[in-house]
């Protein structure tokens, strides 16, 4: 199975299944001498961890990460960092009824078409449980970017269903279970989630992720443009069906005179481009949005087929998120951090000696 690695100089390879013994990853390219402990990674893992509120899956995994290699006396050695998280709360019996049935909207059908078999327990490798290791690896990147370059990465929920959320106060994001920056909408979100749980249904969401302090110059035209790699990374997250950079699809309704980010002696006057021009960072905030579909793991009966091609009706059992967009926030932050870390190392490798007289803001 290919496709388990992302990055060139900062490389992350993950392994493991939803109901396997453990999840793990190998992180290559981390510079030596960086102070690193398991506690540095645990904060973001706790933000993503299931079973932390009544709005998410009640699968209760502690998600305690173990550093197996690449760290000595509390600092990175420059060698491969091995990370492991044990699975402790599997209920594989919840999935015995779907052994020979393809859940509509899931990867069951496509995995079996591709590999000729599938791990039906919680989706196996296709489960979003895999993203725990992305968050652990991303925490390493976030720490390096913040401490060495002052780059801050943060994300939030900006829409759930038909409820738009304004980024009014970033401090609110960590104070509620929705990662919501708009305190005025918390009651509406709560009401929607209660209704969904009662109906046994789910809802889609929009997540925004932003990086500030990113220097100008990151990105490798033409095929490894920074925005292309960010889109690739975010699209690789489970349930993501669309990615926008900056204004995204809103540019369709704009004129060139409105969309261009004019420049004065004081700097850029707008950021419709989302901090990336020609595939290279401009020094402005990098802004990306992603749309997540409503999960198909619901108790509303639906039509499907079994392995013999017979039509059957099914209800998905197990413990699932009514809105997967909530826990996607720390995952999006991690993927953006991984891409920026990789591009920063690549930029330094080729262009460390480049000096320009062009203003930077």
Curated annotation (Swiss-Prot):
Pathway: Metabolic intermediate biosynthesis; chorismate biosynthesis; chorismate from D-erythrose 4-phosphate and phosphoenolpyruvate: step 7/7. It is an enzyme of class 4 (lyase). FMN binds at residues 125-127, 238-239, 278, 293-297, 319. SUPFAM superfamilies: Chorismate synthase, AroC. CDD domains: Chorismate_synthase. InterPro entries: Chorismate_synth (IPR000453), Chorismate_synth_AroC_sf (IPR035904), Chorismate_synthase_CS (IPR020541). NADP(+) binds at residues 48, 54. Its EC number is 4.2.3.5. Its cofactor is FMNH2. Reduced FMN (FMNH(2)). Keywords: Amino-acid biosynthesis, Aromatic amino acid biosynthesis, FAD, Flavoprotein, FMN, Lyase, NADP. Signal peptide: none annotated. It catalyses: 5-O-(1-carboxyvinyl)-3-phosphoshikimate = chorismate + phosphate. One of its GO terms (molecular function) is chorismate synthase activity. One of its GO terms (biological process) is amino acid biosynthetic process. GO terms for cellular component: cytosol. It comes from the Bacteria. This reaction introduces a second double bond into the aromatic ring system. Homotetramer. Belongs to the chorismate synthase family. PANTHER family: CHORISMATE SYNTHASE. This is Chorismate synthase. It comes from Salmonella schwarzengrund (strain CVM19633).
